[in-house]
Amino acid sequence: MKKKKLKTILLALPLLVLLGGAYFPEPAEAAEPWPPRDNFFWLGQINKASDIINTDENLLTKEEGRRFAAAIQKVLDAGSQKGAERPSVVITFEPFLIKAGGPDITKIHAGRSSQDMLTTVSILRQREQLLQLSAALNQMTETLLNLAAAHEGTLIPNYTNGVQAQPNSLGHFLLAYVDAYERDQERIKEYYKRLNRSPMGATVLNGTGWPLNRDRMAAYLGFDGIAYNTYDAGQVFPQEAPIEMGAIASSIAIHNTSLIQEIMQQYAQPRPWILLREGNGNTYVSSAMPQKRNPGILNRCRTDSSTLLGLAVGEAFRAHNIPAGMADGRIRGNDDIVKDTTNVVNQMNRILQALDIKPERALEELNLDWTCSQEIADVMMRKHNIPFRSGHHFASEIVTFARARNITPVDFTYAQAQEVYRKVAAVDASLPKELPLTPEELKDAKDPAGIIRNRAVKGGPQHNEMQIMFANARNVLNANITWQKNAENKVKNAEIKLNNDFIRLLR
């Protein structure tokens, strides 16, 4: 009995390994640290800053400032207990302050409104998530760049209109996506400049009669400055921001799905040259078809990226056809799509780390079709002054001849080329009677590696240009990493200063 049970377990083990993580639950996401950095947290930070600034500016007495600080801290301490109520809007937060500090504490609300405060909270929360997205995108781009560098010499077929078109370096192909994702990072940086401006002091839309120090408030909250026009700050930009973020999310999602589909088409082949390593939740098996190793993380990332596109378009529809001042399309902080965007970026990073690339199989695939035919026409013109269209006609006839006989470029002989050429030359008086190409020239024109070597323009897959592009991409990536860290550090330092100054006020 024991032997039978052991045998059953051993037979099941390969299936469990293949299943990886597809039918088992994904690892649980790490619990958010407590207390969370939610609306309650940021309303607390705004109240701290208001109390400090208004005391310093003599809008509150020193005694009031200290007393109000104690009440604010009492509310924050109570809300930090597990299971405690953490009000998320101004009108439900304020009663807690009144209970802790009496009605006088509402003096800190002079010149403020739920509108500028909650807009500020939403921006602060999205800002934090945007910097996390930036870090994730940098990490994924670095993975992609390293993969491209490792496969500069891997020759692959590239496709246009779904048909094998030209040979290329896998490194060159991947560098194009590095450029694409670095443009996405540039969009994030540009959006961050517009996002990271403080609305505080706009009140509702026309400011306030209280001489609030908007610049100090902006500095305490880690902003780069103030959103100057108070109507724009409170009513126009909050509707515009989700649309711009939606455009960034859409661009990232489309780059994801494009790259995923380049990989997915290989899964239709019995012998792919690029696929996912099995196990670790990358693939999963079929319950009915033993041969299948379904590309689970590709499917999941594509689905989530496509869903993200729908959410991004939804941002525009929410803001469409409403006047400023309506809440329909406003920036919503934690409910915006930045987290979803970060999720698909992290998924793509995992995909790139899981790729199993077979250079020999890629070259075999390349040599099964006539992607070299344009090079034959090019060499005819470059070396023998044959008009391109005449050379193109000759190369096209080679393809027709070879495909009819199931001949690949590797097996196509010089004698067969001469045979095709004579038929073409017989009806084209502008052509020499004999094939001007030498056997060596024809062989080199059919060689994918030779085609890559012979590229002569800036930005091509030839080695010298690849080194330039690798260096440029690395420089851009390093600059993006530095920008993200600097932005994050500025926010952290502002928060440290605010908390330290508030502690001093408490004393």
Language model regions located:
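Short, solvent-exposed positions on alpha-helices
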Residues: 62-66, 108, 257, 388-393
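Conserved hydrophobic residue
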Residues: 59-60, 272-274, 386, 408
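Charged, flexible cofactor/metal-binding loops and thiol motifs
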Residues: 122-127, 131-138, 142, 149, ...
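Bacterial N-terminal signal peptides that target proteins for export
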Residues: 2-11
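Glycine-rich cofactor/substrate-binding loops
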Residues: 23-47, 86, 100-103, 287-507
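Short, well-ordered beta-strand elements within core beta-sheets of diverse protein domains
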Residues: 51-59, 172, 243-251, 375-385
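A helix-coil-helix interface module used to build multimeric assemblies
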Residues: 24-207, 212-218, 282-285, 298, ...
